[in-house]
């Protein structure tokens, strides 16, 4: 009888724990995805802060030329970064216990792998937690779907691209100037500016900014007057009020006359779906583009496409970009290569004797 009571007590304890984890009454919703999200994001954040401040230089290219990335080793907020794991490690899983010592682990850039893998797990669980909370509250699941765009983008630059290139050393450094360096080298090696999926991503980001500004300014300009001239217009809204706070008919009429009638939404629901979908689909395509270029399916090559009747090349913008690409490729990893791969011989010279 005692054993039965103990089992019931443990079931009740487990039941109370489950109820607490999945309760929507908590100030911050935890959820089952949160059980994994919280420790992974805390780990990634803690190691990032410590490494950004104090990590020793990392042999990123695997040629015994360490690169400094932390504040205590001469960097500032702009130049500092978590240097990617060494090319000598490649794609190997490199936890602390795989190294002979902590010094070796730091020298080979172990913190980068630790941060990136925990971060990707954490943001994926954050997306799952968004779906989970929506499910508990009886909401539709599109918040998590929208968040999948930045998750896909992060996964592309931190995981898919290194896999395609064969080494975590090709992943994006965790810093401001490191991000710019990654972008420049990516252009040099993959001609991303000439990739249609990147173009769709640019349209998504810039278009999303434009549509957000248009929507916000239209709504703000067509508020229903509830205040005097001496009060802020924001005081005319009360949280949870049933009536509309702006006149959508006026906004529709204004924009329809500014552009043309069918350029203006007359359905608030379809309008807000469009505002969400446009940037999300654009970033999806960019992430897909990074993931294909990871395996060297690169942007369009229109170099020397135009020639005159004598066969002489007439330079186009594509040729100007190509010259810039070659210059950027020559300059990056300058001690690891004698010349850029694009200029290498197609066949190795034969060796006699």
Curated annotation (Swiss-Prot):
Which residues participate in pheophytin a binding? 126
Q: What residues bind Fe cation, as annotated?
A: 215, 272
| EC supergroup of this enzyme | oxidoreductase
Listed transmembrane segments: 29-46, 118-133, 142-156, 197-218, 274-288
Q: Phosphothreonine-modified residues are where? A: 2
Q: Which domain of life is it from?
A: Eukaryota
Instruction: Write out the residues that bind [CaMn4O5] cluster.
Output: 170, 189, 332-333, 342, 344
Identify the residue position(s) of the site Tyrosine radical intermediate.
Answer: 161
A Pfam family cross-referenced in the UniProt record is Photo_RC
**How is it placed in the membrane, per its record?**
Multi-pass membrane protein
Location of the protein in the cell: Plastid, Chloroplast thylakoid membrane
- Record InterPro entries: D1/D2, Photo_II_D1/D2_sf, Photo_RC_L/M, Photo_RC_L/M_CS, PSII_D1
Keywords of the record, alphabetical order, are:
Acetylation, Calcium, Chlorophyll, Chloroplast, Chromophore, Electron transport, Herbicide resistance, Iron, Magnesium, Manganese, Membrane, Metal-binding, Oxidoreductase, Phosphoprotein, Photosynthesis, Photosystem II, Plastid, Thylakoid, Transmembrane, Transmembrane helix, Transport
Stated EC number for the protein is: 1.10.3.9
Assembly = PSII is composed of 1 copy each of membrane proteins PsbA, PsbB, PsbC, PsbD, PsbE, PsbF, PsbH, PsbI, PsbJ, PsbK, PsbL, PsbM, PsbT, PsbX, PsbY, PsbZ, Psb30/Ycf12, at least 3 peripheral proteins of the oxygen-evolving complex and a large number of cofactors. It forms dimeric complexes.
What the entry lists under NCBIfam families is as follows: psbA
Q: What else is known?
A: 2 of the reaction center chlorophylls (ChlD1 and ChlD2) are entirely coordinated by water.
Please give the family membership noted in the entry.
Answer: Belongs to the reaction center PufL/M/PsbA/D family.
Task: List the protein's name.
Answer: Photosystem II protein D1
**What is the scientific name of the source organism?**
Pisum sativum
Q: Per UniProt, what is the name of the gene that codes for the protein in this document?
A: psbA
């Amino acid at each position: 009888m005692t054993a039965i009571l103990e089992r019931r007590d443990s079931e009740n304890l487990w039941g109370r724990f489950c109820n607490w984890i999945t309760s929507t009454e908590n100030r911050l919703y935890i959820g089952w995805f949160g059980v994994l999200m919280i420790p992974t994001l805390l780990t990634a954040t803690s190691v990032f802060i410590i490494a950004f401040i104090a990590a020793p230089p990392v042999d990123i290219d695997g040629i015994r030329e360490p690169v400094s990335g932390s504040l205590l080793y001469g960097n500032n907020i702009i130049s500092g970064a978590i240097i990617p794991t060494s090319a000598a490690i490649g794609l190997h899983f490199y936890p602390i216990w795989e190294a002979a010592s902590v010094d070796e682990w730091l020298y080979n850039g172990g913190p980068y792998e630790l941060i990136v893998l925990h971060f990707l797990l954490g943001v994926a669980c954050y997306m799952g937690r968004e779906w989970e909370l929506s499910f508990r509250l009886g909401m539709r699941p599109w918040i998590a779907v929208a968040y999948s765009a930045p998750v896909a983008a992060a996964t592309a630059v931190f995981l898919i691209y290194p896999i395609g290139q064969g080494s975590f050393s090709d992943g994006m450094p965790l810093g401001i100037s490191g991000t710019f360096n990654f972008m420049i080298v990516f252009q040099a090696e993959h001609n991303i500016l000439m990739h249609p999926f990147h173009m769709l991503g640019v349209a998504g980001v810039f278009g999303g900014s434009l549509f957000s500004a248009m929507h916000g300014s239209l709504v703000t300009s067509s508020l229903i007057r509830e205040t005097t001239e001496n009060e802020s217009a924001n005081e005319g809204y009360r949280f949870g009020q049933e009536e509309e706070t702006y006149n959508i008919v006026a906004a529709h009429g204004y924009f329809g006359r500014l552009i043309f009638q069918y350029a203006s939404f007359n359905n608030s629901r379809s309008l807000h779906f469009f505002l969400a979908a446009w940037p999300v689909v654009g970033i999806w395509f960019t992430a897909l583009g990074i993931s294909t270029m990871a395996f060297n399916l690169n942007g369009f090559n229109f170099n020397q496409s135009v020639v005159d009747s004598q066969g002489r090349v007439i330079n186009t913008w594509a040729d100007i970009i190509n010259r810039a690409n070659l210059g950027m490729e020559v300059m990056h990893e300058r001690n690891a290569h004698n010349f850029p791969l694009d200029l290498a011989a197609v066949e190795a010279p034969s060796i006699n004797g």
